[in-house]
């Protein structure tokens, strides 16, 4: 990579000529890394875009102001200045470095943080054991103020981080006798120790506004180190990574990963923000093709793999890696966040006010202003004095020309989430962050066809001939060949019945190695049985039909020849008068006797309730018997005579 010689200007302003890159705009870089003698800018694929600050000798910490596209960094050996600002010019393809904080003595900056609302810089001094802050709007010669003095406590402040939304400062105390993680309001009040147990030597720390958590590096005893996280109040502590043979210094977080610099390997490493129980350092190095070369990630379609190492070496560097920052999209991602929306609005108002103060333009400037307003696409806000666009939700790029959902979901529908990140809703049969993983991918072997269930979407395989199993992984030809080879040596071995044809085919080419199994009654087994299911069904239906027909015939005969209701048979016995009434008989002492006494014997009188023998008029009975009457008329006559002729 070719660089033009740098030119020194007053206030240590430096303009380094860079070759004009096709992607050389300020918003193209995603990570900035401080090496010993320069700052390296890389894109999201860790390809080197540019470098800057070559005139410095001992760089360490750095921080990034996304509102004004400024990087603040520290030089440990500069005579006059301690902290500097770096601005990249997109049009000139150059950078300008200016002194921001004057050196006050033999100081050593451990961590650096920036508050975009009040435009204050915060840094820790590991030698003086204090945390300082200063406004970048103040004079360079103005003495910084002390926010926290830890010199009397024996503490050693190391990493610092600003919670812009909740107006707090977090720092790590790396004193091995009593290490802590503490917080304080940016106004200097309400100091709290949020973590003081199960910690050895905390180093770099960062606040993740997207997840409302803090992440820090813990340099453990021996050769071990750990990445840990907790909520902003210190609760819900999690171990993200525990590994060895690293000397990490500073870290940065993005939406889904953590990145840190390692002095031992001179590299940048990454790991997912999700806690992993166990991880092993990857041994696949990234080859450096030239100075400060980084790994180029090929632009290929990701494929599902069985297992991927969580720890990744993303960049090999030619010098010792120290500080690192990442572009988080703070003003785009947190416009709707309940804690950050007010801060984002105030920062935008301040930027608009700064822009309005400088809008004293001529007619030529008005034409230029129109071009500037058209510079930001899709409703982006143009910051004139910084030559950058603040994009609305769902867009990115130097001119907000890139729609984040464009080609993001491979097999699904893309929507912008509440966090302003693209989110995919996958089609049936696909999964993954971008719906790039097919449930059928690599499932069916040996030419099997994969299909999905309609409801459960569970994949299954339709196997070709001579293959079986859930994934068509079982080759029946190979299995049968094994049985038939064993049969050649052991005649009594059992061979599955389906292997007969396969072994017979294989024996044509290798008859000396393959034996054909002989089955008893093979012809009978091969001949299809006549008692198939269709025959059985027809036979059963015939038998049932016969039984039904017999039942109908029997019922018809019973209805036809059903016996009639039994008739009531009557027997009449007529006798002469046995005795005459005596003078003492009265109707109350003896029943009156007719001239002739009658007696009736009734059989089969199931429908009558006659408790005593009634008397009948013999003449009436004779008339009745002479007539052809039915049972009902007989009953009426009997009952009538009982009621009328009892006495």
Swiss-Prot record:
TM regions (residue ranges): 535-555
One of the GO BP terms on file: triglyceride homeostasis
Source organism, top-level taxon: Eukaryota
Glycosylation sites recorded in the entry for this protein: 80, 106, 175, 316, 475
Keyword hit for Transmembrane helix: yes
Key words of the record: Cell membrane, Differentiation, Disulfide bond, EGF-like domain, Glycoprotein, Membrane, Oogenesis, Repeat, Signal, Spermatogenesis, Transmembrane, Transmembrane helix
InterPro entries listed in its UniProt record: 6-blade_b-propeller_TolB-like, Cueball_EGF_LRP_Nidogen, EGF-like_dom, LDLR_classB_rpt
GO CC field: plasma membrane
Pfam families in the record: Ldl_recept_b
Disulfide partners: 376-389, 391-400, 440-450, 444-461, 463-472
Extracellular side: 23-534
Recorded topology in the membrane: Single-pass type I membrane protein
Function: Has a role in spermatogenesis and oogenesis.
Protein name per UniProt: Protein cueball
Organism (species): Drosophila persimilis
Gene: cue
